[in-house]
């Protein structure tokens, strides 16, 4: 009598192969999602930096006055480069980016951008905007630091308007 079906060994081999494929797939998917979160975070940071730089440049082109960022947000281009004025600008910029509905790619519930002077609240996917002193050799002035944190990077991009850091 001929029996049809699979032997126990054949079934174990198939289960082992499926297990190996699943393990490889999970590792690959995990790396893919981490890379996607990092790239989305860096893209948002780059957009924020370009937006700030372009709008500060527009201030110079229009020769001062008020620059409208959106229907609800604007700032005075004629501000002096001191920490108080830059802090106010930072708050306007934060409001603008939050109005756009930006989310943290890492899934954190905290806002994607916030104002702060230290790294205690920095988490993956968040941007911190603060005002920082001009480099040595400049007697006065301040500039904007837009920090970014991912699972691999942690650094600021320093942004300043022409004339902010001067002797």
Feature annotation, model-predicted:
Residues 34-64:
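Membrane-proximal N-terminal amphipathic helix
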Residues 5-9, 18, 48, 86, ...:
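Generic N-terminal initiation segments characterized by hydrophobic and/or small/turn-forming residues
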Residues 2-33:
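N-terminal single-pass transmembrane signal-anchor helix
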Residues 57-167:
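Periplasmic/extracellular, small/polar-rich flexible segments of pilin-like filament-forming proteins
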């Amino acid at each position: 009598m001929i029996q049809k079906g699979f032997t126990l060994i054949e079934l174990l081999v198939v289960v082992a192969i499926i297990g190996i494929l699943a393990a490889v797939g999970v590792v690959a998917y995990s790396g893919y999602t981490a890379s996607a979160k990092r790239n989305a975070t860096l893209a948002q940071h780059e957009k924020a930096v370009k937006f700030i730089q372009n709008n500060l440049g527009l201030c110079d082109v229009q020769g001062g006055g008020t620059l409208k960022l959106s229907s609800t947000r604007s700032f005075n281009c004629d501000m002096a480069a001191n920490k108080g004025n830059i802090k106010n600008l930072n708050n306007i910029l934060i409001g603008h980016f939050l109005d756009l509905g930006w989310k943290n790619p890492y899934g954190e519930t905290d806002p994607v951008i916030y104002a702060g002077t230290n790294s205690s609240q920095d988490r993956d996917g968040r941007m911190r905007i603060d005002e920082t002193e001009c480099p040595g050799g400049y007697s006065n002035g301040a500039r904007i630091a837009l920090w970014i944190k991912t699972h691999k990077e942690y650094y600021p991009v320093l942004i300043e308007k022409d004339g902010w850091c001067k002797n």
